[in-house]
Amino acid sequence: TADYGRATSVAAKSLKARMLLYAASPLFNGNPDYANFKNPDGEQLLSTTYSEEKYKRAADAAWEAIELADAAHYKLYESTSVSTSYPEPNDLTQRSLRMTFIDKEDYGEVIFAETRKAGTYSIQRKSIPYFPRGSWNGIAPTITMIDRFYTANGLPIDEDPEFNINNKLDIVTIPDGTTYAVPGRQTLYMHMNREPRFYAWVAFENGYYECRTTAVSYTHL
């Protein structure tokens, strides 16, 4: 639409809701670490007193943003078909998660888009695994971030009895029938049996990676 990428009323309400949520969070709500966080006049910039009312303000602002977005016909993105030019995950959930912020036709869910064109040495090339065409994987999630993804059972990795967190760095062989990695090859234990968001957003050793045309289909790292 003509307003795509602009600071619309929906974008403003959404940003307000997010800021109030930050204000209510333990990071800012009663955090004693900010006791000496003052301006040059000695005035306290962040209160160190906890206030439950901040959560109510955040919730009210979020509901206001949701109602406004609903009236403006925003909706959750769903990728309904696989591209004929480039390979994409066949699983609907994984494909929708992957394409939400990639599909340039996604005008339904994205509220405040970055519309500037990226240059040659953009975040895209810094994020893509190294290949001869000029990508070098200079940006990657930390192990701590990887640990935050849930297991295939929808549980944190330290709460799922079927996931042995002590073996997360062990090298394992990918079993036959695996759809998110190459069967028979090796990867780390922590890459196995994770939730759809993990496979939609994280590239890992011998996991499938859509970096070629459909004529070649998936390749792997």
Regions found by a protein language model. Give the residues of each.
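Active-site neighborhood of glycoside hydrolase catalytic domains
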Residues: 16
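An aromatic- and glycine-enriched ligand-binding surface/loop that stacks and positions planar moieties
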Residues: 10, 20-218
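Active-site beta-strand/loop architecture of penicillin-binding DD-peptidases
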Residues: 221
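Flexible helix-coil transition and linker loops at the boundaries of alpha-helical arrays
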Residues: 1-3
